[in-house]
Protein backbone atom coordinates (compact mmCIF):
# COMPACT_ATOMS: atom_id res chain seq x y z
CA UNK A 1 0.00 0.00 0.00
CA UNK A 2 1.30 3.44 -0.92
CA UNK A 3 -0.01 5.31 2.09
CA UNK A 4 2.74 7.24 3.83
CA UNK A 5 2.18 8.70 7.29
CA UNK A 6 2.41 12.45 7.67
CA UNK A 7 3.53 13.61 11.10
CA UNK A 8 2.29 17.10 11.83
CA UNK A 9 4.26 17.74 14.99
CA UNK A 10 2.81 21.21 15.54
CA UNK A 11 -0.71 20.16 14.58
CA UNK A 12 -2.82 20.83 11.51
CA UNK A 13 -5.01 23.69 10.37
CA UNK A 14 -7.61 21.04 9.54
CA UNK A 15 -7.88 20.31 13.27
CA UNK A 16 -7.39 23.65 15.08
CA UNK A 17 -7.46 22.00 18.53
CA UNK A 18 -4.31 20.08 17.59
CA UNK A 19 -2.20 23.17 16.85
CA UNK A 20 0.69 23.60 19.27
CA UNK A 21 2.70 26.78 18.81
CA UNK A 22 3.98 27.86 22.21
CA UNK A 23 7.26 26.57 23.59
CA UNK A 24 5.53 25.58 26.80
CA UNK A 25 2.99 23.38 25.01
CA UNK A 26 5.65 21.78 22.83
CA UNK A 27 7.84 20.99 25.84
CA UNK A 28 4.81 19.61 27.66
CA UNK A 29 4.16 17.21 24.77
CA UNK A 30 7.79 16.17 24.39
CA UNK A 31 8.92 15.95 27.99
CA UNK A 32 5.86 15.61 30.21
CA UNK A 33 4.30 12.94 28.02
CA UNK A 34 7.05 10.36 27.49
CA UNK A 35 4.82 8.32 25.16
CA UNK A 36 4.76 11.17 22.61
CA UNK A 37 8.52 11.58 22.83
CA UNK A 38 9.09 7.83 22.39
CA UNK A 39 6.80 7.69 19.35
CA UNK A 40 8.76 10.48 17.67
CA UNK A 41 12.09 8.86 18.52
CA UNK A 42 10.86 5.53 17.12
CA UNK A 43 9.73 7.19 13.88
CA UNK A 44 13.09 8.93 13.49
CA UNK A 45 14.97 5.70 14.23
CA UNK A 46 12.97 3.20 12.17
CA UNK A 47 11.87 5.26 9.17
CA UNK A 48 13.29 7.49 6.50
CA UNK A 49 11.76 10.91 7.05
CA UNK A 50 11.18 13.70 4.55
CA UNK A 51 11.09 16.99 6.45
CA UNK A 52 8.95 19.61 4.77
CA UNK A 53 7.93 22.91 6.30
CA UNK A 54 10.52 22.51 9.04
CA UNK A 55 13.58 24.75 9.27
CA UNK A 56 15.61 22.90 11.94
CA UNK A 57 15.30 25.95 14.20
CA UNK A 58 13.07 24.21 16.75
CA UNK A 59 15.33 23.39 19.73
CA UNK A 60 12.95 20.77 21.13
CA UNK A 61 12.76 18.71 17.94
CA UNK A 62 16.50 19.20 17.45
CA UNK A 63 16.97 17.75 20.95
CA UNK A 64 15.02 14.62 19.96
CA UNK A 65 17.04 14.25 16.76
CA UNK A 66 20.26 14.56 18.77
CA UNK A 67 19.00 11.92 21.22
CA UNK A 68 18.24 9.58 18.33
CA UNK A 69 21.73 10.08 16.90
CA UNK A 70 23.33 9.51 20.33
CA UNK A 71 21.20 6.44 21.11
CA UNK A 72 22.22 4.90 17.78
CA UNK A 73 25.84 6.06 17.93
CA UNK A 74 25.31 8.16 14.81
CA UNK A 75 24.01 5.23 12.76
CA UNK A 76 20.47 6.08 11.72
CA UNK A 77 18.52 5.86 8.53
CA UNK A 78 19.21 8.75 6.20
CA UNK A 79 16.53 11.41 6.28
CA UNK A 80 15.79 14.14 3.76
CA UNK A 81 14.75 17.77 4.08
CA UNK A 82 13.13 19.85 1.37
CA UNK A 83 14.41 23.32 2.24
CA UNK A 84 14.52 26.68 0.45
CA UNK A 85 17.80 28.30 -0.59
CA UNK A 86 20.18 26.20 1.50
CA UNK A 87 23.91 26.71 1.03
CA UNK A 88 26.60 24.03 1.03
CA UNK A 89 27.77 24.72 4.60
CA UNK A 90 24.29 24.40 6.12
CA UNK A 91 23.58 21.29 4.03
CA UNK A 92 26.84 19.69 5.20
CA UNK A 93 26.03 20.55 8.83
CA UNK A 94 22.60 18.89 8.65
CA UNK A 95 24.08 15.80 7.02
CA UNK A 96 26.81 15.43 9.64
CA UNK A 97 24.69 16.42 12.66
CA UNK A 98 21.42 14.59 11.91
CA UNK A 99 22.10 12.40 8.84
CA UNK A 100 19.70 14.63 6.90
CA UNK A 101 20.37 15.07 3.19
CA UNK A 102 19.14 18.48 2.04
CA UNK A 103 17.12 18.81 -1.15
CA UNK A 104 17.44 22.53 -1.74
CA UNK A 105 15.20 24.53 -4.03
CA UNK A 106 15.25 28.15 -5.11
CA UNK A 107 12.52 30.50 -4.04
CA UNK A 108 11.40 33.26 -6.34
CA UNK A 109 9.69 36.20 -4.67
CA UNK A 110 9.17 34.07 -1.54
CA UNK A 111 7.30 31.48 -3.59
CA UNK A 112 7.71 27.81 -2.73
CA UNK A 113 6.29 26.61 -6.05
CA UNK A 114 9.44 24.56 -6.75
CA UNK A 115 8.87 22.56 -3.54
CA UNK A 116 5.27 21.91 -4.45
CA UNK A 117 6.26 20.66 -7.90
CA UNK A 118 8.88 18.39 -6.33
CA UNK A 119 6.29 16.89 -3.96
CA UNK A 120 3.85 16.39 -6.82
CA UNK A 121 6.52 14.39 -8.69
CA UNK A 122 7.04 12.21 -5.61
CA UNK A 123 3.31 11.54 -5.33
CA UNK A 124 3.13 10.59 -9.01
CA UNK A 125 6.07 8.21 -8.57
CA UNK A 126 4.26 6.36 -5.80
Predicted segments with their positions:
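Active-site glycine-rich loop that binds ribose-phosphate moieties when present
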Residues: 25-38, 64
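SIR2/sirtuin-family catalytic core signature
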Residues: 1-3, 14-17, 37-126
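Active-site-proximal beta-strand elements of phosphoester/diester hydrolases
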Residues: 6-11
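PP2C/PPM family metal-dependent serine/threonine protein phosphatase catalytic domain
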Residues: 19-24
